[in-house]
Amino acid sequence: MKMLKSLSLIPRIVSPFQKCYSTDLISLVGVPRVKISKGQNRYLLVNIHTHGFTKYGRVIVRGADVDNHLAIFDSILEELEPEGICAKILGGGRILNEPDNKKIKIYGTSRTFGGADHTRTRNILQAWTTYKDFKITVKQ
């Protein structure tokens, strides 16, 4: 009888671990690290994490041809909030993406969110398979 009582506690013990290590953190892995458009774009460097797990974050790059960096942030929130993922802006700037010439230039700052670490942005882009062969220049 004691054995059955002990076994009944297993779901309560396993449930928190299952949630922490499967659903929430796996949803971070499903978020693409890079989404930028062709041509001249504004971009944001963003640290994303599951709500309550700020220690286990991931840095992503988002860029689009919009009027201001706030529009990019709004689209990031629309994409991530339904998944329970929080976003913290690390800074912004501009990206000139020339896929035909395999060149990318990263420069400038965001008036709204401040300057991003362009070297970190370059490293993320170079790690992404699409931009691995591109010549990426950084202007601080």
Swiss-Prot record:
Whether Amino-acid biosynthesis counts among this entry's keywords is no
Matches recorded under InterPro entries: Janus, Janus_sf
Which residue positions are annotated as catalytic?
H69 (proton acceptor)
Q: Name one GO cellular component term.
A: cytosol
Q: Does the keyword Transmembrane apply?
A: no
By sequence similarity, the record places it as follows:
Belongs to the janus family.
For this entry, the protein name equals Sex-regulated protein janus-B
Name the source organism: Drosophila sechellia
